[in-house]
């Protein structure tokens, strides 16, 4: 049994702009087990991605057009947490933790 897993991490500097430049083509081509995105710069509901076979986890910044992260994974986690427990930092949407 093959236990190889592929992890991708990408600072997209704005996911909406990145979508215009082939993000979905690249996403589908690399077929990653875990695809982590930083600097999404989105608010909840601004974008809907149809990624069959992937669980999606988003952490949005409170400040519009600022920071934000997302993880797309083929593997369902046991638990998910957002932030690091420090309110002055957690409002930026920079951390998502998946437990397996």
Segments from the language model and where they lie:
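N-terminal, active-site-proximal structural segment of metallo-dependent hydrolase catalytic domains
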Residues: 1-51, 61, 66, 82
């Amino acid at each position: 049994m093959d236990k190889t897993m592929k992890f991708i991490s990408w600072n997209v500097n704005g996911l909406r702009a990145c979508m215009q430049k082939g993000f979905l083509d690249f996403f589908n081509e690399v077929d990653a087990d875990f695809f982590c995105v930083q600097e999404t710069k989105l608010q909840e509901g601004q974008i809907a991605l149809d990624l069959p076979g992937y669980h999606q986890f988003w952490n949005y910044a409170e400040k519009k057009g600022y920071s934000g992260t997302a993880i797309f994974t083929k593997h369902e986690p046991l638990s998910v947490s957002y932030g690091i427990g420090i309110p002055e930092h957690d409002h930026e949407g920079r951390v998502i933790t998946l437990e397996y």
